[in-house]
């Protein structure tokens, strides 16, 4: 196991995502940029870009790690098992999902079943 302190003290990479973010920064421009992003190899295996969904002016935003299998196929975040759990939690809290915005940190991902590691 790597030393946690050694990992934390590493310099950040010289490259950033800043050049990939379009001028103006509205959600539609960002969605288009994500759809054509080739900055990392994840786009090669994903079925499609899974951007965000919901109210653009939402006061509540949920951010997951990466799309799951159902999200990859649908092109919409949080429609699989995690989405069903989120829906139950929102209902219990009295929050309408349409008032929230859901997205993932990673926009391209292809889930593959694997054996035990």
What are these regions (language model features)?
Residues 2-117:
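A polyanion-binding, active-site-adjacent surface
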